[in-house]
A protein has these predicted regions:
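A short glycine-rich, Lys/Arg-flanked "PGG" loop and its adjoining helix->strand segment in the class I
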Residues: 153-168
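A short SAM/SAH-binding and catalytic strip from SAM-dependent methyltransferases
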Residues: 137-151
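Conserved class I S-adenosyl-L-methionine
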Residues: 170-179
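N-terminal, positively charged/glycine-rich alpha-helical extensions of SAM-dependent methyltransferases
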Residues: 2-39
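Class I SAM-dependent methyltransferase SAM/SAH-binding core
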Residues: 71, 77-127
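Class I SAM-dependent methyltransferase Rossmann-like catalytic core
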Residues: 34-51
Length: 179
């Protein structure tokens, strides 16, 4: 799978530092064919964190990242990616099925972490193609919520497969309870 994208869309966003203009993923699609989170991004909601930035910070603070091999599922526009890189991991690998996200993350990591080995694979979180037991931490933020039960199980199984003994799968998700 390649990581090339065509920048023909008029919708754009800034990178994690607010610099430059990058095309929004799926901005070439009409509203009826957008994934929900990219529709929200199109209308201005650029960060989807069920518990806000504070919960993201708590999650990352409780996950040992410095000097560790880190995988991030569905990094989106790279807001959490930047926070991960600030914690000086040994390596960073993103995994996303959207080629525009792969392009965004590839640029962001090259600009902001030139001394850290980084990559972003055009793959599904349920089938990353990464080597078994190759990560100390797997990060996923507000992505399981949008999956079917079968999809959730497959993604969790893939995170488990990637983790070394003693590794951590850190997530936070929406938790809806009926009244």
């Amino acid at each position: 799978m390649g990581t090339q994208t065509t920048n023909t869309a008029s919708q754009s966003t800034t990178n994690a530092q607010g610099n430059g203009s990058l095309p929004l993923p799926q901005s070439d699609r009409d509203v009826e064919h957008l994934q929900g989170h990219w529709l929200l991004a199109r209308i201005g909601k650029r960060v989807l964190r069920p518990g806000g930035k504070k919960l993201t910070g708590r999650m990352l603070a409780k996950t040992e990242l410095e000097g560790k091999d880190v995988v991030e599922f569905a990094p989106g526009l790279g807001r959490t990616t930047q926070l991960i890189l600030e914690r000086k991991p040994k390596s960073y690998r993103g995994v996303d099925r959207d080629p525009q996200v792969v392009d965004i993350i590839t640029k962001l990591t090259a600009e902001n972490a030139p001394s850290i080995p980084t990559s972003c694979a055009l793959r599904d979180a349920a089938d990353t193609g990464l080597e078994s037991e190759s990560a100390d931490a797997v990060i996923g933020e507000a992505m399981l919520t949008m999956q079917t039960e079968r999809g959730k199980r497959a993604i969790i199984a893939e995170a488990y497969r990637l983790l070394r003994a003693g590794g951590t799968y850190s997530i936070h998700e929406l938790g809806l309870q009926p009244d």
